[in-house]
């Protein structure tokens, strides 16, 4: 699933490698081709150019490894992206499910001075509206870091219910970048109350995870966009395994 409006190929590739690392997925050229819907030869040519530019190197196992410069640039573009998402939700009040695609445009044009103003304006957030850590904050403000906000280890919903004898109570912690470009899916998650900070009950079903609980309010406070039974109880939602694997939770 790719976002529309990405205008810088180098930054797009750097951010994709950064995303894969966050998800614990080995960054290979094949994974980039899948994520960005590009052909193998196109990806190989771009990776070769980035290697010549000193942004990454290809290890013996074909894994892509960012150089120090490449990691610095990848961190910056992801920081801009997630700060833009925070602004779009909190100030501009764009619907939660739409902010990722819009932020994909902003991340390539935002200056560091604007980043700092947004960061201070919003009260120094350390996570985006999807629960992901905003990286590289120490570059904006000396001594600042998001490292300490990883309080409890989290895991994909699919792992949380694996080998479980019954339902699992958990808190939604984050939704990975990979699924955020799918507006229909993100709206489904919001309507089911599957958003960061929400308590849910998880059960294994064939081919995926059934999610109970959630909340009658989404992250942007819009109760009308949440599916309830008329009594304020959110209807359960069945997530396919390939979606549930990108929704992380912390077990209670």
Predicted ranges, named:
Residues 108-242:
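Mid-protein regulatory/catalytic core that forms ligand/cofactor-binding pockets
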Residues 1-37:
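Extreme N-terminal segment that seeds HTH/winged-HTH DNA-binding domains in transcriptional regulators
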Residues 51-59:
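A short, conserved structural fragment
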Residues 47-48:
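Short, hydrophobic-biased segments on the C-terminal half of alpha helices
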């Amino acid at each position: 699933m790719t976002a529309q409006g990405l205008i810088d190929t180098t930054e797009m590739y750097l951010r994709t490698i950064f995303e894969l690392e966050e998800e614990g997925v080995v960054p290979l050229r094949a994974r980039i081709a899948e994520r960005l819907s590009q052909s193998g030869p196109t990806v190989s040519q771009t990776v070769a150019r980035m290697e010549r530019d000193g942004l990454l190197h290809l290890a013996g196992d074909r894994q892509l490894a960012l150089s120090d410069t490449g990691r610095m640039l990848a961190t910056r573009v992801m920081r801009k992206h997630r700060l833009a998402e925070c602004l779009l939700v909190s100030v501009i009040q764009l619907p939660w499910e739409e902010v990722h695609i819009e932020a994909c445009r902003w991340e390539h044009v935002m200056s560091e001075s604007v980043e700092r103003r947004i960061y201070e304006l919003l009260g120094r957030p350390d996570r985006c509206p999807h629960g992901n850590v905003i990286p590289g904050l120490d570059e904006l403000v000396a001594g600042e870091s998001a490292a300490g906000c990883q309080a409890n280890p989290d895991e994909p919903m699919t792992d949380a219910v694996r080998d479980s004898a019954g339902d699992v109570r958990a808190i939604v912690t984050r939704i990975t970048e990979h699924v955020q470009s799918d507006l229909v899916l993100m709206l489904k998650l919001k309507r089911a109350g599957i958003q960061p900070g929400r308590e849910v009950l998880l059960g294994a079903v064939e081919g995926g995870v059934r999610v109970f609980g959630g909340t009658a309010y989404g992250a942007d406070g819009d109760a009308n966009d949440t599916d309830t039974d008329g009594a304020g109880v959110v209807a359960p939602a069945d997530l396919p395994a390939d979606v549930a694997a990108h929704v992380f939770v912390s077990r209670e």
